[in-house]
Amino acid sequence: MKIKVFQDKRIRAHWDSDIEEWEFSVVDVVGALTDQKTLRAASTYWAVLKNRLKEEGADELLTNCKQLKMLAADGKMRLTDVATTKQLLRYFAQPSTRNF
């Protein structure tokens, strides 16, 4: 696991050698883009956003979102949603995320 930095925000990332792409923690990306103060707030924001995407019929996008164990702030390995750059761009191109 690597840590990437975007506007002074830490984003957990993992290189998937099978698909030869970086996968990023969706919660970390959401937190960075929405300037959430805590990981809990970013997690809540992502949960609401996932529900909106499901309501819009974007289930196929979420189906491709997988979970990996990544090091959490408390030092434990916890499952978190991860997505490639392409998947992230699709999530945030949806109408429900335009006010992002």
Regions found by a protein language model. Give the residues of each.
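An anion-engaging/catalytic patch
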Residues: 1-100
